[in-house]
Amino acid sequence: MGIYDIFDDESARSISGMSIDEMAKKYGTPVIIYSRARIVSNIRRIREAYENRVRMLYSVKANDNPRIIEIMHQESIGSDSASPMEIMMSIFSGIPPEDILYSPNNASEYDLNFALDRGIAINFNTFTQYRKMREKPERISFRINPGFGMGEFAGTTTGGARTKFGIDPDAAILAYRKAREDGIREFGIHMMIGSNNRDHVKIAEAYSNFFRIADRIGREAGVSFQFADVGGGLGIPYVQGENELDIAALGSAVLKEFDRYHFGDLVLEPGRYLVGDAGIIVGTVNDVHNGFAGTDIGMNLNIRPALYGARHTIIPVGERVEGEKITVTGQICENTDRIGDTAWRLSEGDRIMVLDAGAYVYSMSSRYNGRPRPPEIMIMEDGKDVMIRRREDFSDFIATVV
């Protein structure tokens, strides 16, 4: 899984035979382009690594375009949803309620009962959330904070001290006991410790610790788990030199450890790993001055660099000529509106690409500074381009005004 794998060859001029430059001319810029073939390849790579013994739930937060969720459904993948709207997007895209796991945090009674009324299993972030329920669901899970976290950035580390996620193992024992006393008979257990992890040894160790903790919780609470959900967080490289996740080695190690226990299904919640490297942003350089390349790709579209300090590979469309390092910026009135640096020579009018933009880009975008969101285009396996979301216009800005 390399950062250029979405393209037909190292020239990075086409995807599935479709010219990137021609796509920019056809749809304008900025535009987000996805490869369906790449998404499917990523799905099947996980399946092969886990010997078809894993149940996958797509992390909708990574990219909530219904046409992408439809691909997941076509590939027999369920939904990991974090809000009522993600639940509705999943159902709209064909995923049945029984294949959805709702994992909210700080949920309102409305949020929780929304899932309950649709027969969707709830993964509770706290015991107090469970106690809010109007009625008790048939199936529940609790999110465990195992006492450790692991993520690319502090802001994407979701386990351990000083995080708002999950309950500690001792509290979980009491929570499962109470749920059992309430008559619930179907249980799962869940963990999510952080995002964009690429060290298969450390990931496998974290999963092993989770299985051990889950086994103790089950024994002491007197419940058996129909599934053990290790969450998502499987990472991809964003720039040259970053290591790739050895998914085959991870799958082998995890299955070996999982087989020591009796948890029912092993569940994964991949998002970034499935769609992250399957998307690119194509933009235009509008101005070059003082070491900055001013483009139409800003933090309104890709907030990750400003939010986390995340890096993306940025390359010209077409010929690449080495130059001095230049900082790529957008059109937003903030000095944090920086997408990253590149050493390729850029001139006014050039097309550029921001790679690995399939996850946490459009789904985290905004209309800040009155900038409409761009169209999203899917390139099919046969090379045909399909618009799966149009470019926004003024009517979208005032659609909710009353």
Curated annotation (Swiss-Prot):
Keyword field contains Acetylation: no
S-S bridge residues: none
Pathway the protein takes part in: Amino-acid biosynthesis; L-lysine biosynthesis via DAP pathway; L-lysine from DL-2,6-diaminopimelate: step 1/1
Binding-site list for pyridoxal 5'-phosphate: 233, 269-272, 360
EC number from the UniProt entry: 4.1.1.20
Gene Ontology terms, MF aspect: diaminopimelate decarboxylase activity; pyridoxal phosphate binding
Amino-acid positions noted as binding substrate in the UniProt annotation, renumbered to this chain: 272, 304, 308, 334, 360
GO biological process entries: lysine biosynthetic process via diaminopimelate
Domain of life: Archaea
Keyword Transcription among record annotations: no
Gene3D superfamilies: Alanine racemase, Lyase, Ornithine Decarboxylase, Chain A, domain 1
Modified residues (N6-(pyridoxal phosphate)lysine): 61
Names of required cofactors: pyridoxal 5'-phosphate
Record's catalysed reaction(s): meso-2,6-diaminopimelate + H(+) = L-lysine + CO2
Keywords in alphabetical order: Amino-acid biosynthesis, Decarboxylase, Lyase, Lysine biosynthesis, Pyridoxal phosphate
Top EC class, one word: lyase
Any single Pfam family the record assigns to this protein: Orn_DAP_Arg_deC
PANTHER family: DIAMINOPIMELATE DECARBOXYLASE (PTHR43727), GROUP IV DECARBOXYLASE (PTHR43727:SF2)
Protein family: Belongs to the Orn/Lys/Arg decarboxylase class-II family. LysA subfamily.
Subunit organization: Homodimer.
Function: Specifically catalyzes the decarboxylation of meso-diaminopimelate (meso-DAP) to L-lysine.
Protein name (record): Diaminopimelate decarboxylase
Organism: Thermoplasma acidophilum (strain ATCC 25905 / DSM 1728 / JCM 9062 / NBRC 15155 / AMRC-C165)
UniProt lineage: Archaea, Methanobacteriati, Thermoplasmatota, Thermoplasmata, Thermoplasmatales
